[in-house]
Amino acid sequence: MPSPSGDPVVAAPQRLPAAGAAALLRISRLLTTRRITLHALLLAVCLWSVYAIDLATPGLRDRAGHIKGADFLHFYTAGDLVKNGRLQPLYNPPALAAYQQALVPQSTHTYFVASYGPQVYLPFSLLARLPYGWAALVWALLNCALYFGCCYALWRCCPRLQPYAGAVSLLALAFPGFFNLIAFGQTSGPALVLFTLAFLALRSRRNFLAGLAVGSLIYKPQLGLAAAVVFLLAAEWKIVAGALAAAAAQLSFAWGWFGSTVMKQYFHSLLRTSQALPFIEPKLYQMHCLRGFWLLLLPWRNIAGALYALTAVAVLAAAVLCWRSRASLRLRFAALLVASVLVAPHLIIYDLIILAPAFLFLGDWVLERTEAATVPGLRVFLYLGYALPLLEPLAKASHVQFSVLAFAVLFGWIRLATREGPSLGYRASPAAI
């Protein structure tokens, strides 16, 4: 991010060789407010105009022949099952596919596997009262409202970003995580809301409430894995207690509402996850986590799994150190979010929506700490982490997911930043929150 004048003002990094530090400094100086805003504008126009053209066809198939709403079709089908009290097909893939094709005849040759708890599908029983096209539109608009509402609430917590409302709005609109959330019709929007609520609660020193938000991620547990480990190892007992209470309440509600039979079917389906991976993860180049990185890079699944475990443990250990540091809450929370993306065992591009707070907090931090040695690295890899998820075709061809490399290096720069001492704002240490 640039200085308020639009030109970067930074110190050369002291932990890199001279050539590397100079290169980072030169690149970071190119990232002025004007350039970043222009790039965001061009990206937003390209993404959303192409998407609009793709959808501008009669019927429920887009120009590429895919069902409009993409994954929303699965939630719509499951919601209709819940609405009609017909839950037996939910965790039976052949029966679910047959019901889906009867419900939406144009969805032939599109298949899904139910991998969520039944409580996730309950709200979709309301949308299932609408025709499929209208229901998909309502869900997209709801995701837009959740996303921009969270961005606005978090932007209000970033004083150095206040003069850049236009640039921030364009960056939010063009964010690849948001674009793919809408394009896929997925359910990662509520996860962003929960992380936002957790941050706001921590900022107000209400740890138990923060834990309630984190524990509610049990509906999409892979996104809460890093938070669970970090808060447990950092001995944040109020947060842990809140998380356990929220997770238990959500599962208890599901058990009470849907009954033992459905819950047993759900847990049995979780045990069969390895058999369903070809359906859940058909395109490894769409995954933006360490596990996806190693599986895409290496043809040997056992070795890839071992390397994922090793690198995930390293990231989690560093995340705990970040959280226990005396750095600002926004910097530590950004580290937690990037770690959450890296260590998640299953993370598709639309799940990157949870990084929106991290981009805001880190952008605000580099504007505040313009003389910090880590600013050039943070600025450059913030830019790369924002843009590289769009290069999935390159990942498919090269078998290297460059976004994960960018996230890993960005996480390393955040770790270095947490060791530079507390910043001017949000000085509270973990013990004080």
Label each region the model flagged.
Residues 219-222, 248-253, 377-378:
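Membrane-embedded alpha-helical segments of transport systems
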Residues 220, 301, 325-329, 391-399:
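Generic structural signal for short, solvent-exposed loop/turn connectors between secondary structure elements
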Residues 363-433:
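Aromatic-enriched
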Residues 210-216:
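Transmembrane beta-strand segments that form the barrel wall of outer-membrane beta-barrel proteins
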Residues 172-173, 217, 224, 354, ...:
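Hydrophobic alpha-helical transmembrane segments of integral membrane proteins
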Residues 147, 217-219, 223, 227-229:
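Long, hydrophobic, well-ordered secondary-structure blocks that form the structural core
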Residues 2-209, 231-356, 360-368, 423-433:
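Primarily membrane-embedded glycan-assembly and transfer machineries that use lipid-linked glycans
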